[in-house]
């Protein structure tokens, strides 16, 4: 009996590994990291009491599924030299379905198993996986650094102060103060004439 929603898996051959790139130049890695790291975030809106209203400056968290799809895209395109249709305007972002075709076939385990198929394939597999881990480490470091900068308490506090002292915010606060002053004057006037 066939399973429903079965993923069409992608398998690599010994020739695929022989033709693979085992080293991506540093500046190509930097280009990949620059292109991908800045979009691997989700914005969180946090209010002082957890309700909807005047929000504090945004905080950010890592979007791990985007990062996984970017990394799989890099493995497939840069190292294995295979094509896929990128999504969302970047050459390395795989669709979730394409990601599942490779991840569901345990692509990294396929490469690991090639180590047992002779010295040539073993060396290629070791070199490819080592260089890919370097790329992954660079992406992780960049995402971590960006998250730290974006979620920095002092920076967020400065944004909050800036938002509260903008000309628009100041004008709104001034209008509220004028309204309160008028109410106060009316109350004061009412007391002096004996009205309550």
Task: Give the positions of each predicted feature.
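Intrinsically disordered, low-complexity linkers and terminal tails enriched in Pro/Gly
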Residues: 1-5, 193-196
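N-terminal "first-domain core" detector
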Residues: 2-65
């Amino acid at each position: 009996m066939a399973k429903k929603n079965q993923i069409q898996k992608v398998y690599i051959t010994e020739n695929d590994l022989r033709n693979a790139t085992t080293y991506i130049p540093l500046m190509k890695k930097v280009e990949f990291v620059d292109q991908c790291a800045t979009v691997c975030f989700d914005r969180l809106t946090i209010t002082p009491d957890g309700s909807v209203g005047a929000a504090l400056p945004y905080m950010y968290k890592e979007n791990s599924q985007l990062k996984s799809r970017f990394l799989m895209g890099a493995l497939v395109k840069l190292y294995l030299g295979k094509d896929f249709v990128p999504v969302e305007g970047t050459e390395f972002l795989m669709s979730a379905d394409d990601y599942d075709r490779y991840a569901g076939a345990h692509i990294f385990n396929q490469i690991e198993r090639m180590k047992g198929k002779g010295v040539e394939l073993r060396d290629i597999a070791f070199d490819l996986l080592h260089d890919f881990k370097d790329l992954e480490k660079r992406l992780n470091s960049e995402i971590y650094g960006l998250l730290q900068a974006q979620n920095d308490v002092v920076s967020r506090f400065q944004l909050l102060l800036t938002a509260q002292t903008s000309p628009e915010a100041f004008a709104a606060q001034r209008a509220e103060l004028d309204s309160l002053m008028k109410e106060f004057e009316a109350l004061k006037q009412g007391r002096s004439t004996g009205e309550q």
